[in-house]
Each structure stands twice: as structure tokens, then as C-alpha cells.
């Protein structure tokens, strides 16, 4: 993801998940020596030596998201594929209508969109700043 572009590619959660290569990387605690002590200790206890390291992760979540001035319950799903990017999709309800949202960073391009009924755009963003933000989000969420 070193090259930053602004044209997003239409990729589904399933397509991104299926595109993840089978990992051949094995966890070696010696690779953690450069990390701060707290991070190193956490990872040494969380991952068994010799364990295969994942090339992707798929998460399901629920919580609250602030849209406008109010908090709304949401359910979401996210796929992070280390060599391609991430997609996060969520659904919430406002005034009885489903609102569908998504953030994505795929192959160096990013987009954010929210749609009423999954059809009518209420917010869309793309471009270099959105891509930079999305790449930062992916890095932050890569701890999962």
C-alpha cells in the first residue's frame, strides 16, 4: 500500500477475505526485541512460539455510533487483509430507517459512504486525505 491513489475499487467483504493468501509466516518471539517492553510481553503471552501468523482477520461487532447529535446502536463486520487493505461495513437505524455505512482502503485507495436504505447517499468521501486516514485506521485496528 505504498502508492496512494484516489480511485476506489468495488470489492466485497467476502472477496477481500477470499483474496487473503495462506500464511507461511511463523511466530518467533525473537522478532519482538525492537518493541516496547509492554507490547513485547503481551505478544509473547498471546501468541505461542511457532504459531502460524494470520494474513487476514474477519471481525463482527456491535456498539454505538454517533451520527449527528445522537448515538445509535449498530452492527458491523470488518475484514482486514494485510496485503490489500480493509473493509468495514455497518448498519444502524435512524428515525425507523436503516442507514448503511462503509469505510474501505483497498489496494491504496479509500472511500467512506453512508446510505439510507442502502440506496440513497447521505455522505460520501474519497481522495488522498481519506486514503491517509483509512490507512491509519487499518494500522490501528491491525492489533485485532
Task: Give, region by region, the residue ranges found by the protein language model.
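Flexible, processing/modification-adjacent segments and terminal tails
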Residues: 114-144
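N-terminal leader/targeting segments and the immediate start of mature chains
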Residues: 2-57
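N-terminal mature ectodomain segment of secretory-pathway/periplasmic proteins
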Residues: 40-118
